[in-house]
Amino acid sequence: DYPGFASKGAYPIFDNVAAIFSATPGITRTATYLFACTEWVEDAFRGRELLHDIYSRLMNPTSVSLANHIVDLECGAEANQYMAWNFNSGMAAIDGILSHLVGRDDIILSSRNIYGGSFQLLHDWYAKSAKLGVALYWFDGYDQKAFSIALEEVKKNEDERLKMGRKILVYLESPCNPHGYVLDVAGISRVAHQ
């Protein structure tokens, strides 16, 4: 039981105005919003007024409520220090994270057993020289030993990039799609952070 945790049993207290006194949040089923004046439009698009929604694919009361509730569940008393983002698909989430972290000429070391869409994104976008020119490596195996061997090989092969300040990013999916293999994420993470 966390102080300040906005929940009563299985029913959270929603920050969604339409859900006041409701057991579940209201679902916003619109793509566009009306504004009373042009000043409100400008405030919304410049981020000065967070209660003015612009377009449902950007943000809407339903997705904001979901994100805030996830933060409450995950962070408890420290929820006010965190935020969450919702994505409409797993691929959107993967690309959102990668496009934020990966820079031109960086290095990605990925487990070989990943979803086909993830493979295409890494191979056909990030690794293309006309795009980001990322050096893409794959490792077989499921534990920290297999990963450690692959990481040392990548460091040896990409010595020049590393000297230029490029970073190695590790991409894992576990359980792996489509076979369901489970990786030793904790062990691989320990090696990656050494």
Region spans (language model):
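Short conserved active-site loop signatures built around small residues
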Residues: 1-28
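Solvent-exposed alpha-helices and their adjacent loops that cap or buttress functional pockets
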Residues: 17-22, 77-79, 100-101, 130, ...
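Conserved N-terminal alpha-helix of the aminotransferase class I/II PLP-enzyme fold
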Residues: 26-27, 32-92, 96-100, 117-126, ...
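PLP-dependent aminotransferase-like
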Residues: 102-174, 184-191
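Basic, Gly/Ser/Thr-rich N-terminal segments that form RNA-phosphate-binding interfaces in CRISPR RAMP
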Residues: 181
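ADP-ribose/adenylate-binding Rossmann-like module
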Residues: 194
